[in-house]
Regions:
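Short secondary-structure capping/turn segments at boundaries of alpha-helices and beta-strands
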Residues: 19-21, 47-49
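Extended catalytic/binding region for NAD+/ADP-ribose chemistry, centered on the ART fold
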Residues: 26-48, 118-123
Length: 146
């Protein structure tokens, strides 16, 4: 299994989740958001970056792990307003983290719900089977944030 992440940090420790809440978790929980393609990783970063904060370059992390039967959250299982009601997705993701039943959870992107992202549970026993195998530095294309 190959997953992708754009980050300033080359680790899968989920420290950022301790400091800030995200779409699928409340603050105080270690979690890493991953994408199934490099393009969807870039889309998520662009959505969360203002045009004034566009970095001159970014690092794309290629993450490999075992092929797993990964549980998924379907948009059909979510209320119609899930994209605007953060408590719905945060409750679901935080509950998943606390149960610690799987290392990954596939979730729909709030930007393009037909695209799936993966939540990575660093505390799960299988987390050690995932590793960053490549870090690729790219210049950031300014056309994204015009």
């Amino acid at each position: 299994m190959v997953l992708w992440r754009i980050s300033r940090h080359r680790d899968l420790g989920g420290i950022g989740g301790l400091k800030a809440a995200g779409r699928w978790h409340y603050v105080g929980h270690r979690i890493v958001y991953l994408a199934e393609t490099p393009a969807s990783a870039l889309l998520e970063v662009c959505d969360h970056t203002s045009s004034n904060d566009v970095p001159p370059k970014f690092t794309l992390l290629k993450i490999e792990g075992p092929d797993l039967d990964t549980p998924s959250v379907s948009t059909h299982a979510l209320p119609d307003n899930w994209r605007t009601q953060l408590d719905v997705t945060r409750d679901l993701g935080t509950d998943w983290l606390e149960k610690n039943e799987s290392v990954l959870l596939r979730v729909p992107s709030a930007i393009v719900p037909e695209t799936m992202n993966c939540l990575f549970n660093w505390a799960h026993r299988q987390a050690a089977e995932f590793r960053i195998v490549e870090a690729i530095a790219y210049p950031f294309d300014a056309r994204f944030k015009k």
